[in-house]
Amino acid sequence: MIPLKTIEDLISKHSILEKELSSGEVDKKLFAEKSKEYSDLNEVIDDARKYFSYEGEKKDLEKILSDSNSDNEFKEMAEVELKDLKLENETIEKKLKLFLLPKDEADKKNAIIEIRAGTGGLEASLFAADLFKMYEKVSHQKKWELELISMSQSEAGGLKEVIASIRGKNIYSTLKYESGVHRVQRVPDTETQGRVHTSAATVAVLPEAEEVDIKINDSDLRIDVFRAGGPGGQSVNTTDSAVRITHIPTGLSVSQQDQKSQHKNKAKGMLILRSRLYELERSRIEGERSEDRKSKIGTGDRSERIRTYNFPQGRVTDHRINLTLHKLEAFLEGEAFDEMVENLTLQAQEEKLSNLN
């Protein structure tokens, strides 16, 4: 049960914001923030008022049921109404609890997605390319903006590594559950005996950090420049346009050479480094929470096997929630992606509610 004082404060806050915004006297610097807060409260204010009045309505109906002077027909009506009221209140309570859960500010951010071929040689790099194509299709369907940051190709159209930024609305909240090891089971084109091979690729999804999110001192950076190299060490640029940025305190290092301009390579390298440092700090804070409150979903552990794509059986299985979708082709086309994300989000919310209780 949610303390009524909490609900009362929520209703009061809505009323105060409503008066402030309608008065036209709100500080311009705070107007957008207060408008957003008011808009968020608007989504649950009716439910909050119903929840606040629930106990009184319930007592009135229980009084009718216990009154020996009430006729049977009236009691039957009160009994049905009480049952409906309790069911409605349970739904409202769950919605309000979700609203009151601590918000992850990173959910609203854009994302950096990094995909790397894992065990499995050529087949792993081909699978990494398949995953990248899937995220490209999802981005296109949702009208997100996907920008390639760097790409390292292998033979036969595979990818050793690819890094991209994805921009749009609530990107990180949608993609954050993709971090981990993705495993594929299929018969490679080169397999003459028809045997199923298993290979893997790792996916890391980071919230795209802005300069205000994390402070990086220039003195903590070592920047090396060198000539960009092509396949087999072949020089593709006669100027020192490639950049390697090392964050000395953590040892994190980012190399960027996809652009012809040293300035652009440095800017993209800093974007990746900033996002990795931001995620490192988020992970440190998360690690300070007690073990029993850590979520099994969305931990972002890159070594955790999260999903298997089985081509012979046409299925994709997410091991964190034991969900299997027998629509592998549609999933890789981005068409069944939302179904998986919705189930992961629901389970993560259930875990948070359980911890709240």
From Swiss-Prot:
The keyword Protein biosynthesis applies. The keyword Cytoplasm applies. Coiled coil: none annotated. The modification N5-methylglutamine is found at Q234. Keywords: Cytoplasm, Methylation, Protein biosynthesis. GO terms for cellular component: cytoplasm. One of its GO terms (molecular function) is translation release factor activity, codon specific. Residues 284-304 are annotated as: Disordered. Methylated by PrmC. Methylation increases the termination efficiency of RF1. Pfam families: PCRF (PF03462), RF-1 (PF00472). It comes from the Bacteria. It is found in: Cytoplasm. Its main location: cytoplasm. Belongs to the prokaryotic/mitochondrial release factor family. Peptide chain release factor 1 directs the termination of translation in response to the peptide chain termination codons UAG and UAA. This is Peptide chain release factor 1. It comes from Pelagibacter ubique (strain HTCC1062). The gene is prfA.
